[in-house]
Amino acid sequence: DLGLALWAVPGVAALAAWAPIALRAPGRPAGGRHILPVDGLRRDGLAWAVTLFMGLQSALAYCVLGWMAPMLRDRGLDGTEAGLVTSLSILLQVAACLLTPVAAARCRDQRGLAVVLAAAATLALIGMILGPRWAIWPLAVIQGIGQGGLFALALMLIVLRSGDAHVAAHLSSMAQTTGYVLAASGPLLIGVLHDWAGNFRASTGLLAVLGVCTALAGWRAGRNALVRATVVQTPDAAAAEAS
């Protein structure tokens, strides 16, 4: 229960960091009420990279939320220590959610940051499964920072890759609906592999694939460019804007 409650904190922190960027986005609709349709978004490779980055980093996050404590129990930790390690990892996502937007804003593009965060989150989680027991606590710190940074960066990229608020709204919908459907497969596959192998070591291959794919999607989504989507000005929308 504590882990589930703590998971809401990074989201609030990321929203606080993301809101000023969204409010400064060019072409913000009058009063923020009317979002116009856009054309070409689902045909744009950059938009799909943002979507995949959102979904893949979420898959890693769901694996942490759902399976980190059982993974640690499998390593021989008792329930209390496994819960404390998991809580530490999730708590550190708060700091990462606050600091990542600052770091990302200072970068010419966010490709390198995306790769570093994906590597930190993935390798630390794999290390907690395969590495020595004494390394579990420091690896939990690294994992939390990497995972929280990925979440904040995924939200930031929606705004940074959008030319205006209309495109940002549709890109957000695309990234979060399609992305979260993809994300749901992560914990499910971890469970299937555990049932098949009888331990979590078999899941490290899946985690490695998720990490590499997250880094590749982040490298593509992090380049300094805008998605190619055109706002469609319909008569009804124009009348609504005028009102």
Language-model features: locations:
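Helix-loop-helix hairpin linking two adjacent transmembrane segments in secondary transporters
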Residues: 1-23
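Helix-to-loop junctions at the C-terminal end of transmembrane segments
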Residues: 96-109
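A late C-terminal transmembrane helix in Major Facilitator Superfamily
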Residues: 162-201, 206-207, 218
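Intracellular juxtamembrane helix-capping segments at the cytosolic ends
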Residues: 149-163
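Structural signature of the two symmetry-related core transmembrane helices
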Residues: 112-126
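Juxtamembrane intracellular "pre-TM" segments in multi-pass secondary transporters
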Residues: 21-50, 239
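Extracytoplasmic gate region of multi-pass secondary transporters
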Residues: 44-97
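Intrinsic disorder in cytosolic terminal tails and internal cytosolic loops
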Residues: 28-33, 160, 220-243
